[in-house]
């Protein structure tokens, strides 16, 4: 059994790796090769967007944040559970939080990656296991239907969600379907806030389930504040 402190340390080391990405450092050759292959597999995964996703995770995966996040929970399992993960792939690394949640809680992840993002999460898990080899037995990737699992987290379209709800009905499950992000403006937003909203709209080409796709404004609102 890997102790929580070991798991946190492994993810902290992964975060440190992501915080220090340097194209001139041979240590990162594999990372940049993976980015190139991910772009070839999915044209929406531009180098800038993938690097942004890596950077965001680099900021989150630090010892202080991980300790604060896990502090309210007790992870005293008699034995790890196997959690099936059907991951989305609409934006780079969108499914990594599910993998993190399963592993940080001391459970095993049975991972089915989206065909849109089959490379990036596998790369991060490989690096994580280099930092903590004991985690090798805690992650299994598959392209087949799940056959041995205790619970499932599955993400997909509304149609896929209906299938998931039927297929996984006999085990504890968390099913996610389509989501849309909206912004509600009152007219008092600063220039910096509007610039941040613009980023929420266009980052990852607007393909994220939390990408802002609709904006509500007061009657008579000066749209030049947005488009100007």
Annotate each language-model stretch with its function.
Residues 82, 132-221:
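Conserved NAD(P)+-binding/catalytic subdomain of aldehyde/semialdehyde dehydrogenases
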Residues 69-131:
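Conserved small-residue-rich beta-alpha loop and adjacent elements
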Residues 121-124, 164, 226:
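Hydrophobic packing residues within well-ordered alpha-helices of enzyme cores
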